[in-house]
Amino acid sequence: MKKIILAFLTFALIFSVSENVYSDDHMGPSNLQIQLCKLNEGVAMDEYDSFVKDEYFKWAKKNDVEVFFARQTPLYPQNSFIRAGYDFVELLNTSHINAGKGWDKWLGTKSGQKLNEKWQKLASCAVKISAVVPNYLNEKALAEDKDRIVSWNWCSLNEGVSYEDLLEEHAKRASELEENPRGLIGWANVYPRIGMEEAPGDFAHIAVYPDVESAQIYQQDQSDGGWKSYRDYNENFASCMGDGFMIEKVLNDPNN
């Protein structure tokens, strides 16, 4: 089971780009909690959804530990997702401090413990923690779009390449997206942190599109010669596994 869960991370570790990465008015790293979930026997999705929206969100707001919360299901899945057998993926994005505060209240208060017990009766979820660093964000589009497409691509640093080299290259490519976003409304990197010692790479590229048509604009750009830039990136900076796509629905955004 452990290998299945970790193999699934090659598919499911998706970044849910939100304005939370703009905390304190600057682009910087934030906490991304990934919940790989399967409904327990006899539990319907509507029942689970009611728990999340009517109980968890209200509890989080009352306790001042709200997070950006999105749920993802596969669009173009790889075999690792199919083998893992999960029903959906939930992503909770906030500051590292707020994430810790939320967990302390979830585990250390009677109200949190009660909800935790109910959550575990409804679904079985494997929880992983990562850090996410934004490169390019269209804030207006991200704030308005609650139903979108998210792609991921796991990569490992090439020999002799430092993270400083990588960040410099990403900054260069982000500036190019400002001129021509090629269908994207967000791009970031996810870095494994806690419970992810067997992650399939050093980091993942995450791209957000408003819809499938926009995602195909990027694919068209690759077909029209953009593949050369992707080849150069793989040769000179990091070796990547290839894209997978998820459908994302934003269920809670404290900023909107």
Enumerate the language-model features and the residues they cover.
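Positively charged n-region of N-terminal signal peptides that target proteins for export
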Residues: 1-4
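Short S/T/G/P-rich N-terminal loop/turn motif that feeds into the first structured element of a domain
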Residues: 22-256
